[in-house]
Every structure is written in structure tokens, then in C-alpha cells.
């Protein structure tokens, strides 16, 4: 706990005017900052002796669309198929959200000090834009490509910002909250044409009710006797 507070004090002293907030979580410290200060703060966190966060562990995107409005919205499924395990959210529990829809999260590790830290920056625009940190940590290469592919977040300055997990002809970004669960189109190989072709999605949306198996003690004795 003392080490965490020491790190927080060092962050506040060094980045007083460059960060929006410092949150002391259970697992690690989180810094919230604007994209305009991202590169400067990241460079300092990597190079300055009190920090020495020389290792970038992960970069990921977050979509806060409808955050705090509903715990589960899948075409009214909670009111039908999942009603037995679903509780309605009362109006007082709705969380107001006044920040941008998308955020980029960075996880850093200091091998010298054995510290972990999380950076979070909220990004705006269509598409959402944020500077690439690949010149600070080369390991950001594929992490940023993944976030671009799945969320449509553009990392300015990335030398090779291509899709990573979906095919290059894919339309949309599948981890966005408004992307259809069944997708837009499906891809298959056509042997006659000897190439891959796109077709309308053949999956039909439907409500799936989980099978519930209950053990009824009234019949256990009879089953044992028959067995």
C-alpha cells in the first residue's frame, strides 16, 4: 500500500497539469489523460527513473455505448428466455455517462520497480483518433492493429495499420456494441469459382432457453431401487 501511494505521489508531482485523474484501484494505479498528452506522458513513464515502465503489456479498445443504461439488451431476450436469471435495473441505478464513447487502455510494467500501471484515454471523432505509441514501445504494433480492427480506433502514426483478425474485405468493426451479433455477411469458399465469396448471413436470430436439470428427491429412491 505504501509503495502504491509513493507511485501516486510521484505521478501527481510529475504530471500535475497533464493528467485528468489518478485512481488507486485494488490491483493497480490508473491514470486518465487526454490524447494530446499521451505521447509525452508515455515517454516520461518509460524513461524517468522514478517510473521506468519499459514494458508495454497490452493495448485495447473499450466501447462505452449505452454504458450504465442497461445490463443486457439483446432484442428483448432478458424479458423472455433469460427471465429466470435476470433482474430489472431500477431507475436509480442507471449510471450517467458524459465521456466519449471510445477509450484506449494501456497496461505498463516496470521490471526495475515491480510496478504496474494502467493508462486510459478517451478518444473522439469519426473515426476515433489517438496517437500511436509504437515509437515508444515497439510491442504496440499488433496491439494497435487489433484495436483498429475490432473497434475502428485509428492510431495516427502507425506505419502499418491494417486489419489483424478479420479479413481485409471485412466491413465494420465486430467489437463495437452496435455491430450485429450475427454479423453483416458470411464468407465461404466457392469451389466452382475457386475463390472466397460473401453472402448474406444465413443465421436466424432466435431466443435460446438454457436447459435446466433439477434433481428431484421424490424420485431418487425409486431410481435406486429400480437400478
From Swiss-Prot:
<keyword id="KW-0472">Membrane</keyword>
<comment type="subunit">
    <text>NDH-1 is composed of 14 different subunits. Subunits NuoB, C, D, E, F, and G constitute the peripheral sector of the complex.</text>
</comment>
<keyword id="KW-1003">Cell membrane</keyword>
<dbReference type="InterPro" id="IPR020396">
    <property type="entry name" value="NADH_UbQ_OxRdtase_CS"/>
</dbReference>
<dbReference type="GO" id="GO:0050136">
    <property type="term" value="F:NADH:ubiquinone reductase (non-electrogenic) activity"/>
</dbReference>
<keyword id="KW-0520">NAD</keyword>
<dbReference type="GO" id="GO:0005886">
    <property type="term" value="C:plasma membrane"/>
</dbReference>
<comment type="function">
    <text>NDH-1 shuttles electrons from NADH, via FMN and iron-sulfur (Fe-S) centers, to quinones in the respiratory chain. The immediate electron acceptor for the enzyme in this species is believed to be ubiquinone. Couples the redox reaction to proton translocation (for every two electrons transferred, four hydrogen ions are translocated across the cytoplasmic membrane), and thus conserves the redox energy in a proton gradient.</text>
</comment>
<keyword id="KW-0813">Transport</keyword>
<keyword id="KW-0830">Ubiquinone</keyword>
<keyword id="KW-0997">Cell inner membrane</keyword>
<dbReference type="InterPro" id="IPR037232">
    <property type="entry name" value="NADH_quin_OxRdtase_su_C/D-like"/>
</dbReference>
<dbReference type="Pfam" id="PF00329">
    <property type="entry name" value="Complex1_30kDa"/>
</dbReference>
<dbReference type="InterPro" id="IPR001268">
    <property type="entry name" value="NADH_UbQ_OxRdtase_30kDa_su"/>
</dbReference>
<dbReference type="GO" id="GO:0008137">
    <property type="term" value="F:NADH dehydrogenase (ubiquinone) activity"/>
</dbReference>
<protein>
    <recommendedName>
        <fullName>NADH-quinone oxidoreductase subunit C</fullName>
        <ecNumber>7.1.1.-</ecNumber>
    </recommendedName>
</protein>
<keyword id="KW-1278">Translocase</keyword>
<dbReference type="GO" id="GO:0048038">
    <property type="term" value="F:quinone binding"/>
</dbReference>
<dbReference type="InterPro" id="IPR010218">
    <property type="entry name" value="NADH_DH_suC"/>
</dbReference>
<comment type="similarity">
    <text>Belongs to the complex I 30 kDa subunit family.</text>
</comment>
<keyword id="KW-0874">Quinone</keyword>
Amino acid at each position: 500500500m505504501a509503495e502504491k501511494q509513493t507511485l501516486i505521489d510521484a505521478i501527481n508531482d510529475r504530471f500535475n497539469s497533464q493528467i485528468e485523474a489518478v485512481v488507486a484501484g485494488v490491483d493497480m494505479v490508473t491514470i486518465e489523460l487526454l490524447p494530446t498528452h499521451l505521447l509525452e506522458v508515455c515517454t516520461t513513464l518509460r524513461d524517468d527513473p522514478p517510473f521506468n515502465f519499459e514494458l508495454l503489456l497490452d493495448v485495447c479498445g473499450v466501447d462505452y455505448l449505452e454504458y450504465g443504461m442497461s445490463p443486457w439488451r439483446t432484442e428483448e431476450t432478458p424479458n423472455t428466455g433469460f427471465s429466470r436469471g435476470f433482474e430489472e435495473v431500477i431507475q436509480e441505478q442507471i449510471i450517467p455517462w458524459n465521456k466519449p464513447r471510445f477509450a484506449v487502455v494501456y497496461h505498463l510494467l516496470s521490471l526495475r520497480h515491480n510496478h504496474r500501471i494502467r493508462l486510459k484515454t478517451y478518444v473522439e471523432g469519426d473515426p476515433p483518433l489517438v496517437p500511436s505509441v509504437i515509437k515508444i514501445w515497439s510491442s504496440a504494433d499488433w496491439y494497435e492493429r487489433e484495436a483498429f480492427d475490432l473497434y475502428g480506433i485509428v492510431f495516427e502514426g502507425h506505419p502499418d495499420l491494417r486489419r489483424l483478425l478479420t479479413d481485409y474485405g471485412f466491413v465494420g468493426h465486430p467489437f463495437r456494441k452496435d455491430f450485429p451479433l450475427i454479423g453483416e455477411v458470411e464468407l465461404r469458399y466457392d469451389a466452382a469459382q475457386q475463390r472466397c465469396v460473401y453472402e448474406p448471413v444465413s443465421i436466424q436470430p432466435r431466443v435460446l432457453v438454457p436447459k435446466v436439470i433439477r434433481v428431484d428427491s421424490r424420485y431418487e429412491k425409486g431410481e435406486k431401487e429400480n437400478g
